[in-house]
Swiss-Prot record:
Species of the source: Pseudomonas putida (strain ATCC 700007 / DSM 6899 / JCM 31910 / BCRC 17059 / LMG 24140 / F1)
NCBIfam families, per database record: hisG
Any one cellular-component term (Gene Ontology): cytoplasm
Keywords: Amino-acid biosynthesis, ATP-binding, Cytoplasm, Glycosyltransferase, Histidine biosynthesis, Nucleotide-binding, Transferase
SUPFAM superfamilies the record matches: Periplasmic binding protein-like II
MF annotations from Gene Ontology: ATP binding; ATP phosphoribosyltransferase activity
Gene Ontology annotations of biological process type: L-histidine biosynthetic process
Name of the coding gene: hisG
EC numbers for this chain: 2.4.2.17
The name this protein goes by in its record: ATP phosphoribosyltransferase
Domain observations: Lacks the C-terminal regulatory region which is replaced by HisZ.
Location(s), subcellular: Cytoplasm
Length: 211
């Protein structure tokens, strides 16, 4: 049995057509079903519906053989027990710093609000910059407006939400897209099956971008 961990939303919507190219189609609509384990048209493949930030955990610990997660989630997770064999080139965006439009660069310690705490620590450590990281789970744009933080680090798609709140994107940390991740033990135990799926998905990604 192959178990694939996915999260609802944009990643799920963009991944299902790629899986369909490999003949893997859920027997129920994951967006409408309350089930968290969903069978597919292939008897030996099932989908797990989990939180986006939990996908790498399920895969690394072997609760799922494969998963699809954003590069931002994988960078923050930083686990060692999984392979990342394929960039699916879906759910593309940017991980960036942002601050109030026209604001002067703060002197001294920088206050940064983000849910990407590990990414932020690594990023500013590489710059040799002293920072105070403030962990938030949402509404990052609010932090600079009420002087909770000088800057934020967040995923930016169009930038409209930033601009609507008087902020502007500043430094690019990483270009983000969703990646296929594979449990290391599963790759050894079910190598032929998983490699075949990887190859099929790679062809689907390439044909989509050629077309």
């Amino acid at each position: 049995m192959l178990t694939i961990a996915l999260s609802k939303g944009r990643i799920l919507d963009d991944t299902l057509p790629l899986l369909a190219e490999a003949g893997i189609v859920p027997t129920e609509n994951p967006d409408k079903s309350r089930k968290l384990i969903i069978p597919t048209t292939q008897d030996d493949v099932r989908l797990l519906i989990v939180r986006a930030t939990d996908v790498p955990t399920y895969v690394e610990h072997g609760a799922a053989d494969l998963g699809v997660a954003g590069k931002d989630v994988l960078m923050e997770y930083g686990g060692q027990g999984l392979y990342e064999p394929l960039d699916l080139q879906i759910a593309q965006c940017k991980l960036m710093t942002a601050g109030v439009v026209g604001a002067a660069e703060p002197k001294g310690r920088l206050r940064v609000a983000t849910k990407f705490v590990n990414v932020a620590k690594r990023y500013y450590a590489e710059q040799g910059r002293q920072v105070d990281i403030i962990k938030l789970y949402g509404s990052m744009e609010l932090a600079p407006l009420i002087n909770l933080a000088d800057k934020i680090i967040d995923v930016v798609d169009t930038g409209n939400t930033l601009r609507a709140n008087g902020l502007e994107p500043q430094e690019l940390i990483a270009t983000i897209s969703s990646r296929l991740v594979v449990n290391k033990a599963s790759m050894k135990m079910q190598h032929a099956r998983i490699q075949s799926l990887i190859d099929t998905l790679r062809q689907a990604v390439e044909s989509r971008h050629r077309g």
